[in-house]
Curated annotation (Swiss-Prot):
This is Accessory gland-specific peptide 57Da. Residues 56-75 have a biased composition (Low complexity). Transmembrane segments: none annotated. Residues 55-75 are annotated as: Disordered. It comes from Drosophila melanogaster. Keywords: Behavior, Secreted, Signal. Lumen fluid of male accessory glands, becomes seminal fluid. Transferred from male to female during mating and may affect egglaying and behavior after mating. Residues 1-19 form the signal peptide. Disulfide bonds: none annotated. GO terms for biological process: egg-laying behavior; regulation of female receptivity; sexual reproduction. It is found in: Secreted. GO terms for cellular component: extracellular region; extracellular space. The gene is Mst57Da.
Amino acid sequence: MKFLALFVTLLVVLALVSAQKSQNTNHNVIVIGAKKPGAAPAAAAAAAPAAPPAAAPAAAPAAPEAGLADAPAES
């Protein structure tokens, strides 16, 4: 009976350890060298446009309905 209890306990411990290892996949990443504070990630650098952007168009005027929500209702 003691053997069965030890066997079940061992199985439970192994299952818990296995579950924890599968969740901690990013903790064993080795980083060599310090990260530079101004460095951009490679994906962001690749997605950046090669030419400077064109001048932005002027902002459109606000819609006339924008201020009507605060106006009191006329009856």
